[in-house]
Amino acid sequence: MTDADRDASAETREREQAESLARIESGRIPLQAERRLREMATSGAPFSSTLSVDEFALCSKLGLQPLGQVLGASVHQVGWQNLPWSSSWGGGLICELDVIAGAWEEARRRAFDRLAEEASHLGADVVVGVRLHRGAHDWAAGAVDYVVNGTAARLSGSARPGRPLLSDLSGQEVWLLHQAGYAPVGLVAATAVFFVSPSYSTQWARYMTSAVNQELTDFTQGVYAARESALGSLTGQANANGADGIVGVRIEQATAFHSFSVGSSIGGRGDRQGLIITLQAFGTAIRQRERADLSPPRANMELGR
């Protein structure tokens, strides 16, 4: 290879890297990933999947042809989170950290979009067995990461939806859902992040009765507040998609102790301590099919109808 060839190759790599970064900034997948998926779709190479043998057999009976594994990922920076001003810190504080929650939501949206984009390049109708992997935010580092993966599949004898449907249901669960006369509408997910600082009365009660078991009511209330926020968002997404319900709902909760300084702008100086409660909820929205066929399917599964 001549020096001119090496220079041209380096320029090509730099140009492709710049294009990939621009695509990522716009919410798409990198250029190299798209090329690989297009080659997979046209090469006729054997597929790989996360499906077990039983899941593969049942999906085949439903007319779902696995095409390959797909992935979506996003690492998101968390912006500056202000705590609400309060003139009565002695009463405790339970508030939603909307900036942190918003970072989770945006990271998840981009990860889901990239998962669907990868599936589209394979010519898929649906992604089954979606698994979610989330990196808990580090308050100092200020970043969250969201990674999803699953198996892209094509549906025989059915018109393709505009965007591949996403579902965290396994092959067996998709089969049972079809037998019951339902079809998946899509994956729904929500994140709620709350900060709970105990009231002075709660702290005093803990100090005076530290030797006995007792409920920390402020923190319990914070968990309920986070749950109501996350499940409310989950239900809203299902309603927007015309779903009848959500199955397989999973709730994951993480707590982290945090201490910060209280400045004069919020009523005095000192240290304030509390818990950051992060609650993640997700599941698959479903809708009853127009004609529920409880007999074994013959490659005629309908998605979202």
Outline where the language-model segments fall.
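Short, well-ordered alpha-helical segments
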Residues: 70, 84-131, 207-257
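Short, conserved loop-to-beta-strand elements that form functional interface hotspots
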Residues: 126-138, 245-257, 263-278, 285-286
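Intrinsic disorder/low-complexity detector
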Residues: 2-100, 142-219, 260-305
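Short, well-structured alpha-helical patches and their helix-loop capping segments
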Residues: 103, 107, 138-144
